[in-house]
Amino acid sequence: MDLTIIISGAICLVAGLLVQTYPEKQIIMTRNTDKFLSLGERTDVANSVKLQKDEAVIYVSVHVNASLDKKASGYEVWYLSPGYRRTVLDKSVAQDDKSLFPILNSLMEEEYTTESILMAKFIMDGLQAQIGNKSKSRGIKAEEWFVVRNANMPSVLIEVGFLTNQEEAMNLNSDSYLQKTTQGIYNGISAFVTHFERSRGFTTKK
């Protein structure tokens, strides 16, 4: 199954590594210029990807955190709360029997949740292995953040650290630390892709 990978946010080097490793795959950045895109525009880019039979797409948003608590620190990976209900399928999939649509949509939501959690775990493992004791893991969490709520595909939001924490801000401006963070995210996505392809894809066509 062919997989399209969409990268949004702070660390564009991740996309570069993915392009090198997967030249046959479509790697999309939600922006490749300095023009600011709203969160809605970013998820619109993701949702506009047209899938053919045996194709799938994932969305990875990379963000830098901030807090009123200047001591807050660490990195975390978010996925959409499993209890949040939304429409992820085109209603044409059940045009012959509309009563089937809620069932099919619910099944797809569950698939997306499973894949999002798995992707989050792989990425967290990658970050922990690369960053070590330079920063702390805040864990994998579920919430209804805009980017994971509005991307109709398996998706995660990665918060790489707090700019409002003086020490962490210095780390995030360090080339060596950014390289480790980039490598950790890349390793996690790559591990997910490998798992995905070995299982021949575990999401049906949108």
Residue ranges and their predicted role:
Residues D2, S8-K206:
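Active-site-proximal helix/loop segments of hydrolytic enzymes
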